[in-house]
Amino acid sequence: MAVAAVKWVMSKRTILKHLFPVQNGALYCVCHKSTYSPLPDDYNCNVELALTSDGRTIVCYHPSVDIPYEHTKPIPRPDPVHNNEETHDQVLKTRLEEKVEHLEEGPMIEQLSKMFFTTKHRWYPHGRYHRCRKNLNPPKDR
């Protein structure tokens, strides 16, 4: 049994050598077409293919090419204060002009009373007299 297994492994290895022969350090496939296609010249990386010493792994090395500073452009960044379009900065932060305005309590209470159809007294805070007399531990309902 052991001899048959060794022969089968040896024969399998020879079959793989015939199916995937190595020529000049590159993998040469007899039965399949290669899917490798050369990249255009203006592509931003150099591709190099290699085979490991045991012949089992194909290694692809593709470092990015350095672009000279003369060929770059600055990223346009619109001013968030004077830009009419809604930007990410405007969504997360209030505009600088709105920060200058002092928020008063009067208009907010009027807006809330109009929005919820209530009187203005509902939105003012309770005084100390009423807060002291509030029962903090009310009895549970049955």
From Swiss-Prot:
Protein name: Large ribosomal subunit protein mL42
GO CC terms, sorted: mitochondrial inner membrane; mitochondrial large ribosomal subunit; mitochondrial small ribosomal subunit; mitochondrion; plasma membrane
GO MF annotation: an example: RNA binding
Protein family according to the UniProt entry: Belongs to the mitochondrion-specific ribosomal protein mL42 family.
Gene name linked to the record: MRPL42
Presequence positions on this chain: 1-32
Positions of disulphide bridges: none
Main location: mitochondrion
Location(s), subcellular: Mitochondrion
GO terms, biological process: mitochondrial translation; translation
Subunit (UniProt): Component of the mitochondrial large ribosomal subunit (mt-LSU). Mature mammalian 55S mitochondrial ribosomes consist of a small (28S) and a large (39S) subunit. The 28S small subunit contains a 12S ribosomal RNA (12S mt-rRNA) and 30 different proteins. The 39S large subunit contains a 16S rRNA (16S mt-rRNA), a copy of mitochondrial valine transfer RNA (mt-tRNA(Val)), which plays an integral structural role, and 52 different proteins.
Source organism (scientific name): Homo sapiens
Keywords recorded for this protein, A-Z: Mitochondrion, Ribonucleoprotein, Ribosomal protein, Transit peptide
InterPro entries for this protein: Ribosomal_mL42 (IPR019346)
